[in-house]
Amino acid sequence: MSLSITLVIVVISGIISYQGFNNRSFFDRLKHYPVAEENSKEYYRMLTSGFLHGSWMHLIINMYVLLQFGEIIEYRFVDLFGNMGRIIYVLFYLTAIVIADIPTYLKHKDNPSFSSIGASGAVSAVVFAFIMYYPLQGLTFIFFPFFAIPAIILGIGYLIYSSWASEKGRDNLDHLAHFTGAVYGVLFAIVSNPSIIQSFADQIMGAF
């Protein structure tokens, strides 16, 4: 049985993140740093930063979520597009990394104190593509495995929080990238499979 593309992404992310943990110069060259992207045209950072993480916990959480949802979307694309499905999935994931970073690039291109790393924007895109296909699927939290919430409810809450935190938050998380990635996941799901709109609506209406 061949490895899933999702698992390959997890392995590559783990290798690159581990290198970043142990080599600060490597880390600094690959991180999302809008000032360098603007002044030195190092736009590659908006892609490479998606394979870096700041800690083992950061890496593990992102890759755990990606494995939970990514393989489902990957195989859904294979069902829809045949042999092209995995290629489309790779393009989806890679473009999600970049798209999620564009707003923070525009916001912080003159701010030398801002930088970010992590796959969270792309992972958000994958999760929200899942929500478009399975809006009523019960989702649980790692620490509360017996309490399930419909995916659409969690998704709405995530968007509201990410929007608020991108303006008011005082932590070091790139909430704007999370929000942008989530929106991109919805749009990609619709553009790649327009019939999903009717399926989504039918599932929501069927719940009432």
What are these regions (language model features)?
Residues 1-208:
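A detector for small-residue-rich transmembrane helices and their helix-helix packing motifs
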